[in-house]
Swiss-Prot record:
Disulfide bonds join C222-C314, C345-C452, C400-C436, C461-C496, C472-C485, C474-C480, C484-C516, C504-C512, C511-C537, C525-C544, C531-C563, C556-C568, C573-C599, C581-C608, C583-C598, C595-C640, C633-C646. The modification Phosphothreonine is found at T720. A motif (SH3-binding) lies at residues 709-716, 723-729. It is found in: Membrane. It comes from Xenopus laevis (African clawed frog). A motif (Cysteine switch) lies at residues 170-177. This is Disintegrin and metalloproteinase domain-containing protein 10. It is an enzyme of class 3 (hydrolase). One of its GO terms (molecular function) is metalloendopeptidase activity involved in amyloid precursor protein catabolic process.
Length: 749
């Protein structure tokens, strides 16, 4: 029987933790077995895979565990993989269908969320409730050589006991490693690329008050290249479906964390897998596989990943199942807004050791001190290492390490994601970034985001626009003034949905009241325009129905155009069964007439004349209609200015013409040809120039003073003015006294 890998991310309120009579391993103190019908689920998956209708695309899974009934409704999720997703297995590119990845919720329970994959039949997963997270995994992962009456196990996060006693920096490398990495990052031999996107953050949107990146507002997705070594492949049953399910669950976990974080106005940061390379067991003997050796230290393992060129990706990670020294679960290069290389969007560069490397990399392992860590610890480790890539060092200080506080109120909330040691994941702060991390990450995003991030193509909850898949969108909690809609800070399957009992939301359209009900029919919702009458609500929709159009050929746009099917798109000439034409330049037409609206009889260009001319006086009563400023004129050779004069367009301005005149290659070719033909003239000019310079030096040298006492004094130039001394007098005191006053600046009494 094939396997079903089901990765859940559920939100539900349950209280089944705390019973430790059935331990699973040294980390998991209690579990329950699941044994639902795998054949039935596999058939449902195959039917949903081929489904065309909306209803048939859902997969239903019902099972009972921990004292309650679970009714899952899941739909294919393509948001985690880019449209050009590429999969390599064993060195070969294979066509792969990602339709086995699902996202859904518990039927009838708002705010719940499931994310997973369905492949052939059995379940593995993660349950992430509102109050108590739970996880589902295949039983063979824990009972390899034992026959058990169930195919999956389910356990609560309250039943997970992850120790923190392994080393001062358990989970992340110690400070000496980061110091060496920082020094290496500073040794780049190439000038780091400079990114200045300050202007992208200045505009503010009209819908909700928040920062917007005007030029590239939707470039919010970091594309990933993820490799797995042969040990990771062995760990997950030697099937590519199981490996991709693991990658999917990790990416979904960090995607949820980063999307819900406001990085100083930069929001909805998401992740998408662009490429996966799976090293299978046969790659263990492949000499081209850099990860083939079993005993590789964590720093060397990261270096092997960095030695590949990852310019096509925002980040590149390697997943492994290795037990690194000192309990290290992950390692990554720390990004910075400027001054050093490394982190998101970093390009392949040359460093002091003579090697070109890509420092937009990191590594993750799922093994720690001989045991495999729970999924939630691995997910937070991934978010932690990616946080390094995004520019955040480890948290420090009282403000950002509340778990070290003496106050029990702060301490019980736990530390944040970027805490130096691994967190258990069950505390309030364990899945959040501290204010210190937010400040650091926002600076890096501001500098680098637009250099490699891409548009996600997915609806963005929180941008104030109701997009496909959203019921409403009132923005984030600090912006939402809507009592009808859940804001974007709510749980995944709750945000951007209508609150219970609410009929509509003002974010859906102008025909919804602030009381969350539809406006009465005939209430105005759109002002009238030149080509459309006033819009009125219909009483059963939040959106304003299309306005009734005015009659065709109604004048609009200051009587320069006419209405066609409710749009101001026709020429005023059409009102009189004429065609619009362009007034050409003739001796009789000045630059003002070239900016008139001109008409002609159909198929008769020679009849083209201004609306103010005698030819069309019968239609326009002698009134001259002018083009809008900026309109093309004189057969597209110019444009109309605000004074209704046709300004010819000179593609080559004076500076451009001067540049072309000086640097014209033909000019230098002509000069070269002339020199070849008249070489004797060039020779004579050279001799004359040398003689002129020699004569100048000879003549001027006799008049130039010299410090050499053996040379004669310089001769004065003819006509040089000589300084005359004043006549000597016998009144010496009277001559010196004014001089003293001038030099000292004193006044004498």
């Amino acid at each position: 029987m094939g396997l079903l890998r089901l990765v859940f991310l559920l939100s539900w309120a349950a209280s089944a933790g705390g019973l430790y009579g059935n331990p699973l391993n040294k980390y998991i103190r209690h579990y329950e077995g699941l044994s639902y019908n795998v054949d039935s689920l596999h058939q449902k998956h195959q039917r949903a895979k081929r489904a065309v209708s909306q209803e048939d695309q859902f997969v239903h899974l019902d099972f009972q565990a921990h004292g309650r009934q679970f009714n899952l409704r899941m739909k294919k999720d393509t948001s985690l993989f880019s449209p050009d997703f590429k999969l390599e297995v064993g060195g070969e590119t294979v066509n792969y269908d990602t339709s086995h990845i699902y996202t859904g919720q518990l039927f009838g329970e708002q705010g719940t969320l499931s994310h997973g994959s369905v492949v052939d039949g059995k379940s593995k997963g993660l349950l992430k409730p509102l109050k108590a997270h739970s996880y589902v995994e295949p039983s063979e992962r824990f009972f390899k050589d034992q026959a058990v009456p169930f195919h999956s196990v389910m356990y609560h996060e309250d039943d997970i006991k992850y120790p923190h006693k392994y080393g001062s920096e358990g989970g992340c490398a110690d400070s000496s490693v980061f110091k060496r990495m920082k020094e290496y990052q500073m040794s780049v031999q190439e000038e780091p690329e400079k990114h200045d996107h300050k202007e992208d953050h200045e505009d503010s949107g009209p819908v909700i008050l928040r920062k917007k990146r005007a030029a590239q507002a939707e470039k919010n997705t970091c594309q990933l290249f993820i490799q797995t070594d042969h040990l990771f492949y062995k760990r997950y049953g030697e099937t590519r479906e199981a490996v991709i399910a693991q990658i999917s669950s990790h990416v979904k976990a960090i995607d949820t964390i980063y999307q819900s974080t406001d990085f100083s106005g930069i929001r909805n940061i998401s992740f998408m897998v662009k490429r996966i390379r799976i090293n299978v067991t046969s790659d263990e003997k492949d000499p081209t596989n850099p990860f083939r050796f079993p005993n590789i230290g964590v720093e060397k393992f990261l270096e092997l990943n960095s030695e590949q060129n990852h310019d096509d990706y925002c980040l590149a990670y390697v997943f492994t199942d290795r037990d690194f020294d000192d309990g290290v679960l992950g390692l990554a290069w720390v990004g910075a807004p400027s001054g050093s290389s490394g982190g998101i969007c970093e390009r392949n560069k040359l460093y002091s050791d003579g090697k070109k490397k890509s420092l937009n990399t990191g590594i993750i392992t799922v093994q720690n001190y001989g045991s495999h860590v729970p999924p939630k610890v691995s997910h937070i480790t991934f978010a932690h290492e990616v946080g390094h890539n995004f520019g955040s060092p480890h948290d420090s200080g009282n403000e950002c390490t509340p778990g070290e506080a003496k106050n029990l109120g702060f301490k019980e909330n736990g530390n944040f994601i970027m805490y130096a040691r691994t967190t258990s994941g069950d505390k309030l702060n364990n899945n959040k970034f501290s204010i210190c991390s937010v400040r650091n990450i926002s600076q890096v995003l501001d500098k680098k985001e637009n250099s490699c991030f891409v548009e996600s193509g997915q609806p963005i909850c929180g941008n104030g626009l109701v997009e496909p898949g959203e019921q409403c969108d009132c923005g984030y909690s600090d912006q939402c003034k809507d009592e009808c809609c859940y804001d974007a800070n709510q749980p995944e399957n709750l945000k951007c949905t209508l609150k219970p009992g609410k009929q509509c939301s003002p974010s859906q359209g102008p025909c919804c009241t602030t009381d969350c009900t539809f406006k009465r029919a005939s209430e105005n919702c759109r002002e009238e325009s030149d080509c459309a009458k006033m819009g009125t609500c219909n009483g059963n929709s939040a959106q304003c129905p299309p306005s009734e159009p005015r009659e065709n050929l109604t004048e609009c746009n200051r009587a320069t155009q006419v209405c066609i099917k409710g749009q101001c798109s026709g020429s005023i000439c059409e009102r009189y069964d004429l065609e619009e034409c362009t007034c050409g330049s003739t001796d009789e037409k000045d630059d003002k007439e070239l900016c008139h609206v001109c008409c002609m009889e159909k198929m008769k260009p020679h009849t083209c004349a201004s609306t103010g001319s005698e030819a069309w006086k019968a239609y326009f009563k002698g009134k001259t209609i002018t083009l809008q400023p900026g309109s093309p004129c004189n057969e597209f050779k110019g444009y109309c200015d605000v004074f209704m004069r046709c300004r010819l367009v000179d593609a080559d301005g004076p500076l451009a013409r001067l540049k072309k005149a000086i640097f014209n290659p033909e000019l230098y070719e002509n000069i070269a040809e002339w020199i070849v033909a008249h070489w004797w003239a060039v020779l004579l000019m050279g001799i004359a120039l040398i003689m002129l310079m020699a004569g100048f030096i000879k003549i001027c040298s006799v008049h130039t003073p010299s410090s050499n006492p053996k040379l004669p004094p310089p001769k004065p130039l003819p006509g040089t003015l000589k300084r005359r001394r004043p006549p000597q007098t016998t009144q010496q005191p009277s001559r010196q006294r004014p001089r003293e006053n001038y030099q000292m600046g004193h006044m004498r009494h």
